[in-house]
C-alpha cells in the first residue's frame, strides 16, 4: 500500500551537524596533553607570550633550553608567540615527559581557537600522542631487556 502524494514522507530531513564553532576571541581555552606519565592542563588566554607553569616562569620550571624550545614550538609554527599567555598545571613524569605533554596541550588549544592552524600543527606532528611508554622489567633480567652476563663454562 502506498502513501498518498499529499502526505509528508515518513523520514524528515535531519538538520546537518554544523562544524564545531570556534571559541570566541578573548575567552580562555582549556586543554589536556599527556606524554609518558605526565599530564598537563593548559589555559590559553590572549596576552603577550607569558608562561605560568605551576606558579613559575618557563625559565624557572624548565631551565633546559631544549625543553623551552620544544614547548614554544606550536606557537612558533603558527606564528603566534606573542599572542597568548599560557597557564599550566603539570603533574607526574619528569621534565622530558612534561615538556612533551605541554607541547601537545598548547597545540590542541591553538586548534580549538582556530581550526585553520590544524594542518600546519598536524604536519609538524604536534597533535599526535606519543604513545611510547616505559617497558616493564621482566623477572630473570636486570632491566626490561638487559640480561645478566652469560657464562658458557
Curated annotation (Swiss-Prot):
Q: Which GO terms describe its molecular function?
A: RNA binding; structural constituent of ribosome
Origin: domain of life:
Bacteria
- One short Pfam name that applies is Ribosomal_S9
Q: Which UniProt keywords apply?
A: Ribonucleoprotein, Ribosomal protein
Task: Report residue spans for region: Disordered.
Answer: 1-23, 121-153
Q: Where is the composition biased (Basic and acidic residues)?
A: 129-138
Any one cellular-component term (Gene Ontology): cytoplasm
- Alphabetized Gene3D superfamilies for the sequence: 3.30.230.10
Q: Where is the composition biased (Low complexity)?
A: 1-19
The annotated regions of Basic residues compositional bias extend over: 139-153
Any single GO BP term: translation
Q: Which family does it belong to?
A: Belongs to the universal ribosomal protein uS9 family.
What's this protein's name? Small ribosomal subunit protein uS9
UniProt lists the gene as rpsI
Amino acid at each position: 500500500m502506498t502513501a498518498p502524494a499529499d502526505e509528508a514522507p515518513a523520514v524528515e530531513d535531519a538538520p546537518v551537524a554544523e562544524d564545531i564553532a570556534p571559541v570566541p576571541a578573548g575567552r580562555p581555552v582549556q586543554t589536556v596533553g599527556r606524554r609518558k606519565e605526565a599530564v598537563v592542563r593548559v589555559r590559553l588566554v590572549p596576552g603577550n607570550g607569558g608562561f605560568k607553569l605551576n606558579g613559575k616562569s618557563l625559565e624557572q620550571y624548565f631551565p633546559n633550553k631544549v625543553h623551552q624550545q620544544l614547548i614554544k614550538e606550536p606557537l612558533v609554527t603558527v606564528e603566534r608567540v606573542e599572542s597568548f599567555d599560557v597557564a599550566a598545571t603539570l603533574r607526574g613524569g619528569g621534565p622530558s615527559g612534561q615538556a612533551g605533554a605541554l607541547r601537545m596541550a598548547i597545540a590542541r588549544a591553538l586548534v580549538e581557537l582556530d581550526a585553520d592552524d590544524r594542518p600546519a600543527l598536524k604536519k609538524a606532528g604536534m597533535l599526535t600522542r606519543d604513545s611510547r611508554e616505559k617497558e616493564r622489567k621482566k623477572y630473570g633480567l636486570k632491566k626490561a631487556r638487559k640480561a645478566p652476563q652469560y657464562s658458557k663454562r
